[in-house]
Regions:
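N-terminal interaction/assembly modules
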Residues: 1-131, 136-138, 142-154
Length: 154
């Protein structure tokens, strides 16, 4: 199902796509006001964009990430939980960190290594943490993803 968003920017690279995906997923995690997937995506796509730049339509990989993460969120959360320290739960994670982890786990588990090498998925997640979170979160996200990578290689 392609997202129906009337005003969406054309993504110029995968990093921008991942930023928009994380912003979309973030809005769907424990929202104070219920929001639909289309509303969250529209807001994420329009946030921070110059209206003069023009709008040309959604990126196929953005649609794939957002739809995929949304459809597999429960499984992704179970897998993420497996890599958290014993005294940590998903509810203790910052919403932005959970959004970054969901996108990264989705890429590592559901996107082929040929399309997105695991090293790229991890590096992108760490870069997103640098942008949207703090140094502790960056290290935490890197550690969680390192655990998943270790298991995927075995």
């Amino acid at each position: 199902m392609k997202l129906m968003v009337s005003s969406v920017t054309k993504m110029s690279n995968r990093h921008q796509v991942r930023e928009k995906a994380v912003k979309t997923i973030f809005q769907l995690i424990r929202p104070q006001v219920p929001v639909s997937l289309d509303q969250a995506c529209a807001f994420a796509l329009e946030a921070g964009n110059d209206p003069e730049a023009g709008f040309e339509g959604s990126d196929a990989y953005l649609d794939r990430l957002v739809q995929g993460v949304n459809q597999t969120a429960e499984e992704l959360d179970q897998r993420i939980s497996h890599y958290l320290a014993e005294d940590w739960t998903l509810d203790r994670l910052a919403r932005i960190d959970l959004a970054i982890l969901r996108v990264a786990f989705y890429e590592l588990l559901y996107v082929s290594e040929d399309e997105v090498p695991s090293k790229v998925a991890v590096n992108e997640a760490v870069e997103l943490a640098k942008t949207f979170s703090d140094d502790k979160s960056k290290q935490f996200i890197n550690g969680v993803l390192a655990g998943l990578l270790k298991d995927l290689k075995n």
